[in-house]
Every structure is written in structure tokens, then in C-alpha cells.
């Protein structure tokens, strides 16, 4: 009878910090504001663009039932956009200023969706389009305590859209909501799905931080509300039409970082960094040849490595939290992974959560074997044995089938929140623990 032989070994892993560079910022959230990084002393600025979508069965009441009218034409009583936010970094009471710009056309250029790109500002803002400036605080000081105490309260930045609006055809409306209502009743098919809405009615809006500093917030939902009245059975009722910036439509964040300040951290060798948004990644060189040497015909059952956090000694009241999730991806695959909307497969891409003061990848043996085979077959790139640790956010979907449920990953995105962690490594190699097996 064959006997299973188990062996273990460990190997050094070299790590270093690298500049994140220009990363794909398409995400399910937007980020807005300006904040001074306590680690670098430099400012991070975040602006974002969003489109708006509708449900497939979107419809409005019969035009004849609308009470809100002017000279026989349907009008909106009012219109506003609300930026619903959470995950505030910095001083929530800091006075901030934003400017909202209407887009002239839907964003279609993939290059415009990267953090360093100014293409949206240079190529997509409508000249003479709808613009609104707004002062705000992320403490939501304009909402009274009674409303904040309500169960369904969610803080938001409220942007009025009630001034006259002139569309691209030169037609002027009472407000932006009136434009939407009259467009709907003249051609309801333009509101039949998000694609037609974006291409024919609302290309999108860009929200730019133009004043103040001290905070950045995560905008997890952007909703446009159109308020009007209808008459039914002799009574008048208030009604709302809403259009949402959700994960089904395009959202992207533009980031301004101080690259020189980031480079000073990259040059440190006392550890490595992960900094978001679009700041610093950690690169690992895996000792593939050493791991496989003498075990070419053995099974590699597991290869485990932990990236341990160096505790933050900052005394700043706004010390940054560590990224919640990180992706391990081959260095030569990082650009295509995000551009092609791939998700982790736990064969050559892995996600780990921040837990017990670090990130643990329990088994990357399939990646080790794949790298070795690529080199052996002559298909390896110059970075064949290098991986990059990238802070990410993920989305998932749960499907219920009777008493059973299954959860599936639906998206992996570059983390655009303001987070930072210093990890063991650099001058001090990490250890990867390997378990082999073979039959004798």
C-alpha cells in the first residue's frame, strides 16, 4: 500500500512598496472632498461623476392627472439631487464647497475612467449647461435633530435644481425637473431603460470639490428627485419621480494625490505600504523556483502567507484605518483584471480581509504552480513571479433557493476610500509556509 508522505518548509518573500499609478476608478460609490493625509502632510482631493438610471418598468401618471402645470404644460414643483454619504474621513464639521456640472454627453472613453484622467472635465462638461455651487458639511448641520432621530434617516448633501434650465436645443424650462417631465410626456420611450435615459435625456453629472478642506465622504447613492402633484378622485396628492446613480450605471472618481509625498513613503524600507485612493500598493516576489525545487512531482497542498500590520503610532485624531479587503493578483495581470471586470477565482487571484491585525492568504499553491509552469513553458513575462497587493472593495449577490442560499461575487473594484496601513516587509523578508505531499 502506498504511503502518503507530508513535508513542510518555509521560504523568504521579498516585498516592496510601489506607486499605484493611474488606476481604474469605476466603482459602485463616488468620493467627494479634500483631506490632509496625516502620514504625508499632503492633500487628497476627490471628485466624482455619476450617471442616472431607471427601472425597466418606469412610468409616470397620465399627463391629464398632473395638477402641476403652467400655461397647460406639465411642470415640476421642485427638483433636487441628494448625495447620500457615509464613511467620513476627517473633520465632519469642516465647511466644504462643491460645484455640480451637467455632462454634454455620456462618458464613453475608457481612459476617462482612470483616477489621473482629466478627460471628463476637458471633454464632457457641457458649455453653458446646468451648474450649481453648494456649501456643505458632512455633519449635515442643516438637518434638524428630529429628522436625524428618525429610523430611516440617512445624511445627504441636498443640491437644488430649481433655477431655470435651458437644454441643448435652446428650450428653457422652469427647472430641471420640468425638463424631465416634459421630455417624458413627449417621448416616454426615452425613459424605458437606463441606456435610453442616459443617451437621450440625462448624460450624467460631475461633482467637483472646489473649496474648503478637512473631509472626504463616500457617496454610496446619488438620487435625483422630481416633485409634482396629481389629482385622483377629486383629491390632490404629492408625487415623486426618482432617478438613481446605482451600480447598474457608470460612476467614477477622479483623484488628485501628491506623488512626491507618496514617493517618500515608497522609498522607506522599514516596511511596505498600502494607501488608497490610488496611492501605494505592495509588490511581492514569490520564491517560485525555490518552492518547487526538489518537489517537481510532488503536490503543493498549501502555500500560506500573512502580511502583518505594523501598528499605527500616529497621534492624529484623523489617523487612517487599514483597507478592509485586499486583492493578490499577478503583476502582469493587474491592468486587464480591472479593465475586463474580472473577479477573484482563487486560482491566480485572491481576496483577503483585514483580520487579526493583518491579511492572510491561506493557500496560493495554485498560483505558485501556475507561475512555475509558465516559466517552464516559456510563456512567462518579465514579472512572472511577482504579485501585487491591491486594496479593493467587492460586491456580491445572494440567491435563495428554498431553505438554502448561495452567495456569488459580482465585482471587484479599486478601493477609492481614504485608508492606509504599513506592513511588515521591506528590509525584513516575510515567510511563506508550504506543505507538500507525495505517495511513496
Task: List the predicted regions and their residue ranges.
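Secreted, disulfide-rich extracellular signaling modules
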Residues: 1-440
Amino acid at each position: 500500500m502506498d504511503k502518503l508522505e507530508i513535508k513542510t518548509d518555509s521560504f523568504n518573500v521579498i516585498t516592496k512598496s510601489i506607486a499605484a499609478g493611474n488606476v481604474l476608478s469605476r466603482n459602485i460609490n463616488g468620493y467627494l472632498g479634500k483631506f490632509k493625509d496625516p502620514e504625508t502632510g499632503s492633500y487628497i482631493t476627490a471628485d466624482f461623476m455619476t450617471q442616472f438610471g431607471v427601472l425597466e418598468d418606469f412610468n409616470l401618471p397620465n399627463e391629464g392627472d398632473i395638477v402641476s402645470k403652467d400655461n397647460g404644460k406639465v411642470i415640476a414643483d421642485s427638483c433636487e439631487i441628494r448625495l447620500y454619504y457615509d464613511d467620513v474621513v476627517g473633520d465632519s464639521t469642516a465647511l466644504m464647497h462643491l460645484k455640480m456640472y451637467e455632462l454634454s454627453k455620456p462618458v464613453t472613453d475608457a481612459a476617462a475612467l482612470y483616477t489621473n484622467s482629466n478627460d471628463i472635465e476637458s471633454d464632457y462638461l457641457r458649455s453653458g449647461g446646468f451648474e450649481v455651487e453648494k456649501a456643505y458639511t458632512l455633519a449635515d448641520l442643516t438637518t434638524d435633530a428630529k429628522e436625524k432621530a428618525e429610523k430611516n434617516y440617512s445624511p445627504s448633501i441636498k443640491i437644488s435644481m430649481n433655477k431655470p434650465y435651458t437644454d441643448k436645443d435652446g428650450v428653457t424650462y422652469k427647472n430641471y425637473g420640468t425638463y424631465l417631465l416634459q421630455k417624458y410626456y413627449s417621448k416616454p420611450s426615452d425613459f424605458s431603460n437606463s441606456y435610453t435615459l442616459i443617451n437621450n435625456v440625462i448624460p450624467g453629472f460631475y461633482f467637483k470639490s472646489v473649496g474648503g478642506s478637512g473631509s472626504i465622504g463616500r457617496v454610496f447613492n446619488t438620487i435625483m428627485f422630481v416633485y409634482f402633484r396629481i389629482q385622483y378622485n377629486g383629491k390632490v396628492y404629492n408625487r415623486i419621480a426618482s432617478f438613481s446613480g446605482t451600480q447598474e450605471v457608470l460612476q467614477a472618481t477622479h483623484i488628485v494625490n501628491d506623488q512626491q509625498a507618496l514617493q517618500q513613503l515608497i522609498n522607506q524600507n522599514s516596511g511596505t505600504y498600502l494607501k488608497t485612493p490610488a496611492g501605494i500598493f505592495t509588490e511581492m516576489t514569490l520564491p517560485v523556483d525555490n518552492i518547487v525545487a526538489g518537489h517537481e512531482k510532488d503536490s503543493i497542498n498549501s502555500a500560506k502567507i500573512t502580511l502583518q500590520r505594523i501598528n499605527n503610532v500616529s497621534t492624529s485624531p484623523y489617523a487612517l484605518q487599514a483597507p478592509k479587503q485586499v486583492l493578490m493578483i499577478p503583476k502582469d495581470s493587474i491592468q486587464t483584471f480591472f479593465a475586463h471586470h474580472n473577479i477573484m477565482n482563487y486560482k491566480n487571484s485572491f481576496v483577503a480581509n483585514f483580520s487579526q491585525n493583518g491579511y492572510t492568504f491561506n493557500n496560493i499553491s495554485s498560483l505558485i504552480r501556475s507561475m512555475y509552469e509558465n516559466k517552464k513553458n516559456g510563456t512567462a513575462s518579465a514579472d512572472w513571479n511577482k504579485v501585487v497587493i491591491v486594496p479593493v472593495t467587492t460586491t456580491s449577490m445572494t440567491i435563495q433557493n428554498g431553505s438554502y442560499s448561495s452567495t456569488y461575487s459580482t465585482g471587484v473594484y479599486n478601493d477609492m476610500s481614504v485608508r492606509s496601513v504599513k506592513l511588515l516587509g521591506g528590509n525584513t523578508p516575510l515567510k511563506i509556509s508550504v506543505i507538500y505531499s507525495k505517495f511513496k
